[in-house]
A protein has these predicted regions:
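Short acidic/polar hinge/loop motifs at secondary-structure boundaries
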Residues: 123-124, 131-157
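Face-selective signature of the C-terminal outer-membrane beta-barrel domain
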Residues: 246-255, 288-443, 477, 526-532, ...
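Transmembrane beta-barrel wall of Gram-negative outer-membrane proteins
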Residues: 185-187, 192-221, 226-264, 288-310, ...
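Structural signature of Gram-negative outer-membrane beta-barrels, strongest in the C-terminal barrel
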Residues: 245, 367-379, 402-535, 592, ...
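Membrane-embedded beta-barrel scaffold of Gram-negative outer-membrane proteins
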Residues: 202, 211, 310-328, 467, ...
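C-terminal beta-signal and adjacent terminal beta-strands/loops
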Residues: 482, 533, 634-641, 660-712
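Gram-negative outer-membrane beta-barrel transporters
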Residues: 420-421, 425, 433-434, 521, ...
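Extracytoplasmic beta-strand/coil segments of soluble accessory domains associated
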Residues: 60-61, 85-131
Length: 712
């Protein structure tokens, strides 16, 4: 019996990618239904270019022995998406929540970021067009990327981010920008809804020979569903490309984002039961805010001398100005009933400027049965400014001078070797070399805290992919994880002084299946992606809230922890006749995150992550562009402390989406939390919480949103 050749095997992977892209609402829609007066040549050429770009991303995914999800940015236009929590809703293994509906969100991938410093969102490396956005020390404190500025988002969970050079617990997320070559000449989006939300977005672009350019202006205002949670955001996103030759493309990206967001603060259980949407009193008196101005400039080039070789290179510079009142005055009456008035012992307003340089180099070569990818990421971050006393949102004297520096170099190589027909061996390694230099000077005493350390590790990976059918495959892999502490964690080391934390490290094993059914266009089509993983971690860095200075944290290394789980994404397109079909989609995650025979916490569950999280929808669609159906969320109970004494209740939500899509326009409406359930969205993590602990923030109540997009 003859066996398929390596070329046939690659074709099988591409077939899988194409079918998944055509059938999965998370990864792609089949395209706009043509209007009667549309130019068929223009429409076809546009779709061919977009699909070619998308299929390249999907083909890369098909050569990764682990959990990778591709989200099509076009799907964001059919529902209310204002932040990354909305955008990543259907990505299994990634748990995202917003405390007020604004940009400040909680995000965890495979159990990353489950502690009191969840505001820095470490454990996940963010990229934009392949260039690093996350700072050199690994934190994402100041901002997240705007998902509406992305053509696609690629989420590589855990060690599957090796092809991006990352080795951290949560993996990597890469947002790929649209260009004038894969977008309409002009688009206008208008949207709004509950809680005073008003959004507008205008995109214009053009192509002239070997030059192209695209500019987007974005505005979002919302009062928020809690008191003191208003957000005003203005953004400008632009890129220009030059096809210098048949082999060389160059592109420049520019971004400016100005976001001012009020923070409502957490509540006690009694306050939550009284009114879950009230603001914490100190959040109002302290005027808690997260105000960030961001400017970013990047250049990226692609050189493809032939079909078997491709070189990508790029540089980026980002400046972030942070103004962040976050702790109100903590007053202590030292003499009780005596004549002395209470004295302020602590308050906090952080005002810093953060500058990050980044660079990227990736070379892909196909050499016989080998598909080799080698790369380099470099980054350097300098944060300067101060920690001030907070007087109603105004600076009231400098407490600490901040001068933090970090740098990182990541080198990686991976070979996808077709060792036999239908079998691919994937092996490689990442090397990381990174430094931290934290300088915090107390103004009153002149004492300098100076934790400083260098970290290095070699992190190998080996896996295998077995093509089962032309449109399905199985995979397995074993990898090493490694993550150095952030500057936030070093400056909050529970030991104080100049002591430094150890880097987290461990090993993870993963197996899974992914694929799509292969049949006639009028048959039911299924697609699936499932992974099971187990990670044994040493020296995980966890932080608890500092009760002596609420709003700050204390960090330490934990001897052993376990991060294990099951991730599944399943969907279908079921014909009903008459041009109608049902498209169910289910994203399900099971988490088993715990301490491992810890001297203090034994085998307690890690906080913040639910045991299970299920999100999905059941859409009815027709060939004319109409769609409607329910959405649902089923989220299990979570612990709010390491001691497992404070349990946050599970919740279930029901929603509804409806819309209509045509060649030149589309409209949508969405109702969230249709039954108006009161539930906890995010919360602070303590060592041992009590009913009087102010840690709870409400999830979104019943809300209605609508949007209109016009294409010219």
């Amino acid at each position: 019996m003859s066996l398929p050749s390596r070329t046939a095997m690659r074709s099988s992977c591409l077939s899988l990618a194409v079918l998944a892209a055509l059938s999965c609402p998370v990864t792609a829609f089949a395209g706009d239904p043509p209007s009667d007066d549309a130019d068929p040549q223009v429409a076809t050429l546009g779709k061919v270019e977009v699909r070619a770009e998308k299929n390249g991303v999907e083909a890369e995914r098909a050569l990764t022995p682990g959990g990778v999800t591709v989200v099509d940015g076009e799907t964001f236009e059919q529902r209310a998406v204002t932040n990354m929590a909305d955008a990543l809703r259907y990505v299994p293994g990634v748990f995202t929540q917003s405390g007020t509906g604004g940009d400040a969100i909680f995000i965890s991938s495979r159990g990353s970021n489950l502690d009191a410093t969840n505001y820095d969102s470490n454990g996940i490396t963010l990229f934009q067009d392949g260039l690093p956005v996350t700072t050199a020390d690994g934190n994402n404190h100041n901002r997240f990327l705007d998902p509406l500025a992305a053509r696609h988002a690629v989420i590589a969970r855990g060690a599957n981010a090796l092809t991006y050079g990352a080795s951290n617990l949560g993996g990597a997320i890469d947002f790929l920008s649209p260009t004038a070559r894969n977008s309409p000449t002009m688009q206008l989006f208008l949207g709004g809804g509950s809680h005073g939300q008003v959004a507008a977005r205008l995109t214009a672009g053009g192509v002239s020979g070997n030059l192209d350019g695209l500019v987007t202006l974005d505005s979002l205002q919302r009062d928020g569903y809690r008191a003191h949670s208003r957000q005003d955001r203005m953004g400008l996103y632009a890129n220009a490309g030059w096809q210098a030759s048949d082999d060389l493309d160059l592109r420049v990206f520019a971004t400016h984002v100005d976001s001012d967001e009020e923070l409502a603060g957490p509540l006690t259980r009694a306050q939550f039961e009284q009114d879950p949407y009230q603001a914490q009193s100190s959040a109002i008196s302290g005027n808690f805010q997260l105000n960030v101005k961001t400017d970013r400039l990047a250049v990226k080039g692609t050189w493809s001398p032939d079909a078997g070789n491709r070189l990508e290179f790029g540089l980026s510079y980002e400046d972030q100005d942070l103004y962040h009142p976050i702790v109100d005055k903590v007053m202590v009456d030292f003499d009780g009933p005596g004549p002395m008035p209470p004295v302020e012992v602590f308050s906090l307003l952080k005002n810093t400027d953060q500058r990050t340089w980044g660079g990227m180099l990736r070379y892909n070569a196909r050499l016989g049965d080998h598909d080799v990818l080698a790369g380099l990421n470099v980054a350097n971050t300098h944060e300067s400014g101060g920690l001030f006393r907070n007087d109603g949102g105004q600076r009231n004297g400098l407490r600490t001078i901040v001068d933090n520096r970090s740098d990182s170099v990541e080198v990686f190589v991976v070979d996808r070797w077709t060792i036999a027909p239908a079998w691919t061996l994937v092996y490689g390694a990442q090397g990381v070399f990174t430094g931290r230099d934290v300088r915090n000077t107390d103004v009153a005493s002149g004492v300098l805290r100076h934790p400083k350390d260098d970290y290095a590790s070699l992190n190998p990976r080996i896996g295998v992919i077995r093509v089962l059918t032309p449109t399905s495959e199985a995979f397995a892999s074993v990898s090493r994880l490694y993550e150095a502490p952030t500057t936030f964690e070093l400056q909050d080391d529970v030991r104080g002084g100049d002591a430094t934390l150890d880097a987290m490290h461990g090993s993870v094993a993963e197996i899974g299946l992914r694929g799509a059914s292969n049949g006639p266009a009028d048959a039911t089509r299924w697609h699936w992606d499932a992974s099971l993983y187990y990670a044994a971690i040493r020296d995980e860095i966890l932080s608890i809230d500092n009760v002596a200075a609420p709003g700050t944290s204390l960090s330490t290394n934990v001897d052993r922890t376990v991060h294990a789980g099951i991730e599944a994404l399943v969907g279908a397109a079921i014909p009903l006749g008459g041009g109608y079909r049902i498209e169910p989609l289910l994203s399900a995650t099971y988490n088993a995150f715990s301490f491992d025979d810890d001297a203090v916490y034994a085998d307690n569950r890690l906080p913040a992550a639910p045991r299970h999280a299920i999100r999905g929808e059941v859409m009815v669609r027709n060939d004319k562009g109409f769609f409607a159906g329910p959405t649902f969320d089923v989220v299990g109970a979570r612990y709010a402390d390491f001691s497992n004494t404070y349990r946050v209740a599970a919740y279930e939500l029901l929603g509804l989406r409806v819309g209509f899509e045509r060649e030149r326009w589309e409209v949508f409406g969405e109702v969230r939390n249709l039954l108006d359930r009161e539930y906890v969205g995010v919360f602070s993590v303590l060592d041992r919480a009590s009913a009087g602990s102010a840690i709870l923030q409400a999830g979104e109540p019943r809300s209605v949103y609508a949007g209109l997009r016009l294409r010219f």
